[in-house]
């Protein structure tokens, strides 16, 4: 199928690649859009922006951040879909169409992380939207006044400080694979939401490479009435001490 320019806004050009994909281009910067769902090829976009700024910024790096993980959780809740459905991997077809496609709502968050300039522009666009109508203004201030702090980060910090007071040691100990929540004379401690227990065990094993003589300890919060049997089996098998902190 031959390419054709479908529409143009000032210097922004939209090109139909085929019936499914469209390329949106501004000068030498472009994005690939999946017309079926509006998802955008974030792999390609991050690569292009990284070359422009001379510093590698990848989607994988963004996704590893604690804040990013919580943003993904919140987006899934708002859209009423599973987290997995926010991402689509395209591994076949023309090379330029391959990569990780993500929900358009996440694209703004990723580029916000990459570019302070873009973040500032988004803030001003929101301000423009707020001023457009009293209804918009009401929605804005309602969201602003009811904004919830990061539960995971807040709770982790509370537990971290209590354990530091109890056991002593050092918090946020930096390693090549991440930061240890709390390290004492004989323990490396990871604090995690129940639903992220697998991540926590993986982190403990990564940290234990640097501190092989220290005991691996996992503190879980937000457990409630959830089943711990499988977690206990895994922890026992891999010599991880499990504690519940609810």
Curated annotation (Swiss-Prot):
SMART domains reported for this sequence: KilA-N
Superkingdom of the organism of origin: Viruses
Pfam families in the cross-refs: KilA-N
InterPro entries, alphabetized: HTH_APSES_sf, KilA/APSES_HTH, KilA_N
Residue ranges annotated for the KilA-N domain, each copy included: 20-129
SUPFAM superfamilies to which the protein is assigned, alphabetical: DNA-binding domain of Mlu1-box binding protein MBP1 (SSF54616)
Molecular-function annotations in GO: DNA binding
Span of the signal peptide: none
Protein's name in the database: Putative KilA-N domain-containing protein L33
Lineage: Viruses, Varidnaviria, Bamfordvirae, Nucleocytoviricota, Megaviricetes
């Amino acid at each position: 199928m031959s390419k054709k320019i479908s529409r143009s806004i000032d210097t922004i050009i939209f090109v139909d690649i085929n019936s499914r994909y469209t390329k949106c281009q501004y000068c030498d910067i472009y994005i690939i859009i999946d017309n079926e769902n509006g998802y955008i090829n974030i792999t390609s976009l991050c690569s292009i922006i990284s070359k422009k700024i001379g510093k590698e910024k990848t989607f994988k790096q963004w996704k590893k951040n604690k804040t990013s993980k919580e943003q993904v959780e919140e987006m899934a809740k708002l859209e009423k879909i599973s987290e997995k459905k926010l991402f689509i991997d395209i591994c076949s077809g023309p090379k330029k169409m391959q990569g990780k496609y993500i929900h358009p709502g996440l694209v703004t968050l990723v580029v916000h992380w990459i570019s302070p300039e873009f973040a500032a522009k988004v803030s001003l666009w929101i301000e423009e939207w707020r001023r457009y109508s009293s209804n918009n203004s009401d929605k804005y201030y309602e969201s602003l006044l009811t904004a919830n702090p990061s539960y995971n980060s807040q709770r982790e910090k509370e537990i971290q400080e209590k354990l530091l007071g109890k056991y002593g040691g050092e918090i946020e100990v930096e390693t090549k694979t991440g930061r240890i929540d709390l390290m004492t004379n004989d323990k490396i401690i990871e604090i995690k939401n129940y639903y992220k227990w697998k991540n926590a065990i993986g982190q403990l094993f990564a940290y234990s490479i640097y501190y092989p003589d220290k005991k691996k300890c996992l503190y879980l919060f937000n457990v409630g009435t959830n089943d711990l049997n499988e977690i206990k089996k895994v922890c026992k098998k891999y010599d991880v001490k499990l504690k519940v902190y609810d």
